[in-house]
């Protein structure tokens, strides 16, 4: 059996066991206090209510049945019942009498103690000395001797012993009670306020006992204020100055204060004065004509004189006299306009706080409002700056120039006391008529003044310490168009013409329109150079790669073919000779350039192979067709069937043998074959081979023509020369059977005589000689292979005069060679 309970804020129920079927409310509260550790129940109370019916059990004797669920909540405890004791007035009267007698005795004896201690209770933990004990004895003597209780009470209430013993009739449990009762609420204790101080308490303001200090009648009177001094810890005596109103106590008993630091104060004041301006430093344009001070809230008299004044000064003047300073009487105070420009100028000068002439000159720009009514035409004045001579130079004008207009703009630089070397610049406008009539005269005068101006002397400027910068003087510089021939360093730009003649602009492929006269940079040069009229009327002649007097760079001039070198190197792109002439192509990188270069080389090699291979094939085809036609001709005419061979002299045989043995000829034949690209060759070797091959191909026609002329001359002079029989025959004829060799020898001996001269006349065309040259090289290669395989003896190179060559043998030799070359090519 149990009772279920929980707080309202709890989630689960707790149980309290019980013995019977019922339990009282008081017993249930005690068990709840015990289980929840709520103390004895004196500080708080618990209200119990039914969880289902919300019925509160207010009576502690009320019975609660078992298995009931209740809710509990805490409430403040009930007020305690005070204990009231009966007072004994007789004992109190005796105590008061005893205390009154003791106060009289203590007041008389405690005077030396007050001299030693400035207040009672300062030395709280000292042992009472003999006079205090003597006063206690006197108090006991004054009390009745037969009353023991009175003596004990008097001993307990002795004021000298209040610091270590607390009376039973104290009004609060505070710790501070009895330790100098000068504070509110009985010192640092608390409780009900005590209006009557304890015996022996003396007010510190008036030195009268009977009241606390907060009840003293002298509160608020400065004559009774207590001065508190402190020791000058860490302060040297040299920095202390004795005064009656000091706060530091000196060893002599006087009081002192700190001396002011004059040096630091002067430095601070100097810093403040350096950032402020005096009234005399401001220009007169910023001062009010009435008060002679810097204008405050500058206002403009818009109806009369258009001058600026202080707003207060001019307003008071108009209200008092009903007239302006200039004498106009039709003005009102409402007609004044604020001069914003002047106000901003004054504010900037005051805020700047420095004496820089640059800042002052830029800020002190005063514009008179008369220019608003009569704005003069803006014109440049030809007067030079007054910085050179220190004097103002008037602008040149005509005699009939009117002087009715006042100067509209005056720019003055502030001349301060520490910057006395500044120069005032005044810029005056020029009349419109004077500008129109004398513009040319003024321009000439300005130019003459600029040219004839003496050298300026630099005047030293005395600048203050707070100045931020110096005024920079602009030096006159010549314009770019006035430069002549010596300054011809003009960059190569995209313009159509170059006025300084330092080469040609890109994109001018031989046509330039900028050379129809003498260029501006050529002072003193005539139209034609050294008698050359030039390709255009009055233009420069084409300089074929030659520099002219150090002015013209010897780089390409205009067209591509007019530059160095005159003969371009082999396999060079002519566009490379120009100065970036091929601008239509985009700028390529190094990789793209190398790839393009390799591709061009490969194309050239392919062209060379095709040209050489085509010539050889064409020559071989021609010879084969001729032989076939000779073989297939009519058998009636055997001589016409066999074409007469060309005359071959002994010189030709010797030249062939020398060509076979000479390394130059071998190298030339080696290069006639298509070049094989080797991966081991570097780029430099490949370029070198291509250049050398190009040179040999270029020299090959000349050598062929020269040899042909020699052969033609010899053949014409000696047409009946016998044909040498030492020509090489085919390898198959040399290894044939004896019957065939003897038959061939007989056939050769019966050959016909030499053909006429007209049939062997050489053809003068280069193609014919070139094809013959190719045939000879092919024949030599085949014979060389035969010699290498069959190891020919050196005796075969010797001539045998006994055997005469025949036409049939020579024709058979050539036919066999051609057929072998064709078979090898196929």
Swiss-Prot record:
InterPro entries: DWNN_domain (IPR014891), RBBP6 (IPR033489), Zn_knuckle_CX2CX3GHX4C (IPR025829), Znf_RING/FYVE/PHD (IPR013083)
Zinc finger (RING-type): 288-326
Gene: PQT3
Enzyme class, UniProt record, top EC level: transferase
Zn finger region (CCHC-type): 203-216
Quaternary organization: Interacts with PRMT13/PRMT4B in the nucleus.
Designated name of the protein: E3 ubiquitin ligase PARAQUAT TOLERANCE 3
Modification type Phosphoserine: residues: 278, 397, 800
UniProt domain DWNN: residue ranges: 3-76
Main function: E3 ubiquitin ligase acting as a negative regulator of oxidative stress tolerance, probably by mediating 26S proteasome-mediated degradation of PRMT13/PRMT4B, thus preventing APX1 and GPX1 accumulation via the reduction of histone H3 methylation (H3R17me2a). Confers sensitivity to cadmium CdCl(2) and salt NaCl stresses.
Composition bias type Basic residues, residue spans: 790-799
GO molecular function: ubiquitin protein ligase activity; ubiquitin-like protein ligase activity; zinc ion binding
SMART domains in the record: DWNN
Subcellular location field: Nucleus
Placement of sequence motif Nuclear localization signal 2: 695-702
Induction: Repressed rapidly by oxidative stress such as paraquat, hydrogen peroxide H(2)O(2), mannitol, drought and cadmium ion CdCl(2).
Location of the motif Nuclear localization signal 1: 668-675
CDD domains in alphabetical order: vRING-HC-C4C4_RBBP6
Basic and acidic residues biased stretches: 588-624, 651-667, 680-706, 809-826
Tissue specificity field: Expressed constitutively in both shoot and root tissues.
